[in-house]
């Protein structure tokens, strides 16, 4: 249950962060904004590491295997860039829908094929149908929502 709550908090924070980052980009540049996001995240993480008792030695990073797992930070820089770009291009709601939909599809494929050391999971029609329903849901043109007979 705590995992679900933390995931919900993460989703809410990501939505707010994306809007903040997009606004900073409008006033600076996308790479400067992305760099600031990464640097500020680094500072927060280092402070948290010091405050919480420094669990894990810095040298333990050299023992991470496989080494490509250390690319998470570099991927984070491109995530920051692409989120900022998409929010500026198509807005926060559309961006979130596409981002989350692709995350679900990719996560399912990673599990299905056992990529990156994740335990391989068997194919399940219900998961495939669920993914298809999500993709179909975002494929419906956004403008159709304005044609609704019920206006709230």
Where are the model-predicted features located?
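C-terminal transmembrane-helix exit sites in multi-pass transporters
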Residues: 105-125
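Loop-to-transmembrane-helix transition segments
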Residues: 3-8, 59-78, 126
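Specific transmembrane alpha-helical segments of multi-pass solute transporters/efflux pumps
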Residues: 69-90, 140
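Hydrophobic transmembrane alpha-helices of multi-pass small-molecule transport proteins
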Residues: 123-143
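Conserved small/polar residues in nucleotide/adenosyl-binding loops
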Residues: 150-152
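Membrane-interface helix-cap regions at the ends of transmembrane helices
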Residues: 42-64, 112-116, 139-143
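Glycine-/small-residue-enriched transmembrane alpha-helix faces in small-molecule transporters
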Residues: 1-31, 78, 82
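Structural motif at transmembrane-helix junctions in multi-pass transporters
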Residues: 26-30, 82-98
């Amino acid at each position: 249950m705590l995992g679900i709550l933390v995931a919900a908090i993460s989703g809410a924070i990501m939505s707010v962060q994306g809007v903040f980052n997009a606004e900073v980009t409008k006033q600076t540049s996308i790479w400067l904004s992305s760099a600031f996001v990464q640097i500020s995240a680094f500072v927060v993480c280092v402070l948290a590491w010091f405050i919480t008792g420094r669990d894990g030695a810095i040298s333990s990073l050299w023992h991470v295997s496989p080494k490509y797992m250390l690319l998470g930070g570099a991927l984070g820089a491109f995530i920051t860039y692409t989120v900022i770009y998409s929010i500026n291009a198509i807005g926060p709601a559309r961006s979130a829908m596409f981002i989350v939909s692709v995350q679900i599809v990719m996560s399912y494929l990673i599990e299905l094929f056992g990529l990156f050391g994740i335990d391989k999971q068997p194919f399940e029609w219900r998961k495939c149908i669920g993914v298809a329903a999500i993709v179909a849901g975002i494929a419906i043109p956004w403008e159709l929502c304005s044609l609704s007979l019920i206006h709230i």
